[in-house]
Amino acid sequence: MDRFLYYPLSLMPYLVITLIVSFTMHELAHAYVAYKFGDDTAKKQGRLTLNPIKHLDPFGTILILVAGFGWARPIPVNRRFFKKPRLAGVLVSIAGPVSNLILAFIGFFLLVLMHAYGMEMLAAFSTGLDQFFSIWIQLNLVLFLFNLLPLPPLDGYRIIEDLVPPGVRAKMTQAESYGFIVFLVLFVTPLGSYVLWPMLNAGRDSILKLFSAIFQPLL
């Protein structure tokens, strides 16, 4: 069975739990910020909820288990409802990745607390909890960094769209049709192994060092 999966079968329960929570919070963050700025499109579609069924894309979720990458159902956003479309657009786009950064921070904090104060009480579960928190932290950091890449249709691309002049934005909108080709090149060719993943891993490690520095007194 392991040969059909990107991750070991023994880690699947931890991975599935992490994906469900991370994808749900990511999309809910988009929906909530859009709603606060006046766009109730997602709310009307039942997306302003913690129910993961409303946010998970079946194919995208399965794909991440077998190929290492995937996606959730994107939140619909209607910019016409925003009084300040560019500002609201940036904040809506960045809300998703920030939610993953917050989840990673919470996971790191709980892991530190467990090792600092609760290891004796949790000794029987320490190995499993270590594995779970490791997956939780690293996957959320990768989601944070990956979604900030300036590639369509990722959040990083949307942020740039709202920061550039209207003329440039129009050209970026036209270029979105090439997004699938870009992702195909990154994930099917060696380019991803030599460029994308080393970059994401370096960013992840830098954030982990920052977390460690923050919690140094407890380590």
From Swiss-Prot:
GO terms for cellular component: plasma membrane. The active site is at E27. Zn(2+) binds at H26, H30. It is found in: Cell membrane. The chain crosses the membrane at residues 4-24, 52-72, 94-114, 132-152, 180-200. Pfam families: Peptidase_M50. This is Putative zinc metalloprotease YwhC. Its cofactor is Zn(2+). Binds 1 zinc ion per subunit. Keywords: Cell membrane, Hydrolase, Membrane, Metal-binding, Metalloprotease, Protease, Transmembrane, Transmembrane helix, Zinc. It is a multi-pass membrane protein. Belongs to the peptidase M50B family. GO terms for biological process: proteolysis. GO terms for molecular function: metal ion binding; metallopeptidase activity. Its EC number is 3.4.24.-.
